[in-house]
């Protein structure tokens, strides 16, 4: 299971750099969609493995710190997303639910196009230039996820 792999961000960045893909990704001009750890890798730095990432988004990825006894990490399950903006988030209805599985999060930032609240509010999705991301899994999010993927294909 993906949750059992430690330091996924570090391992992924080592692979991308070893194959020159970090620079290739930065140079892409077509729409790009990063999902889950893909969102995190497009940020500046990740606490997961303490690794510098691709840096499209000028924000650092943080590890969840449970605040109350009911807070579970990894965050796993359905959660509501809100404050939707960007063509990626069109036609989703009000505050749709999407499926999340992650232990690290991207804080709210200038490029946040959807917000989610678990332990604290954070970025459920980002957009800058031709780069779009989802912390949640659209492929596991039913009709809402299907609409997001359709929106992406129409960009």
Where are each of the predicted segments found?
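Short linear Ser/Thr-Pro motifs
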Residues: 1, 44-46, 103, 141
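Short, small-residue-biased leader/transition segments that mark boundaries at the very start
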Residues: 3-5
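Cysteine-nucleophile active-site neighborhood
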Residues: 8-75
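Amide-donor transfer/coupling interface in amidating biosynthetic enzymes
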Residues: 27, 60-155
